[in-house]
Amino acid sequence: MTAMTIKDLKVRLEAVSSLSDPFFEELKADKRLGVQKAVSSRKRALEAILKEEARLEAMLTYEQALYQKGFQAIAGIDEVGRGPLAGPIVAACVILPKGCTIKGLNDSKKIPKAKHEAIYQAIQKKALGIGLGIIDNHTIDRVNIYEATKLAMIAAINQLKGSVSKPDYLLIDAMTLEVPIPQQAIIKGDASSMSIAAASIVAKVTRDRLMLDYDKAFPGYGFAKNAGYGTKEHLQGLHQYGITPIHRQSFEPIKSMTLR
């Protein structure tokens, strides 16, 4: 064993996919520090992979229970954009195949923005159906953000497109909808349900793209970076350039600005 270079050992370790692989036991006899460091590194990597696989499997708990009850087209629903001062609220409805997991999927707020697009594309490839609901700032001002959220979610259900476009059960992130479909509201569902997490990413990427377009139409507010949230740059833009057609006039400080 000692005849093998550490470089060659590292290459072979990369091919090891199980913590019970006998190669680890063989390497115990090799006392070289570089070898033992490589072994520890590979074991940590495998432990991280197992932990991630277990997390993803746990995110199918709600879906698996529903499959056992006979439901087939289970849709996850989530929204993005309740808090911003500008732009629409966007909801997505996603139906995934039975037992489908998507690498790296989680609540969109817990995923680095650089990874959003790749996960979004993976969802687009695997999903049986995807629907979007987009409610603009004018409607938000007219009905309030809570009601606008429900409108966006219902629109997303109605806009489902794909090989499966009629869900027989809804898993919704912390909301109940007045639709004739069995449903369950799950607190923090975007972190505990694969279907809701998929909807979270689809809604997030869709809204971010819209805000990029708005950044070009209304420069000076930082919409490309802040997505309409009330950052320092955004508030400075409001002070310097005023209110745009996409600002929510029922939200402060815009509401007070309209009264001056």
From Swiss-Prot:
It comes from the Bacteria. Its cofactor is Mn(2+); Mg(2+). It holds the Pfam family RNase_HII. It catalyses: Endonucleolytic cleavage to 5'-phosphomonoester. Keywords: Cytoplasm, Endonuclease, Hydrolase, Manganese, Metal-binding, Nuclease. Belongs to the RNase HII family. NCBIfam families: PRK00015.1-1 (NF000594), PRK00015.1-3 (NF000595). This is Ribonuclease HII. The gene is rnhB.
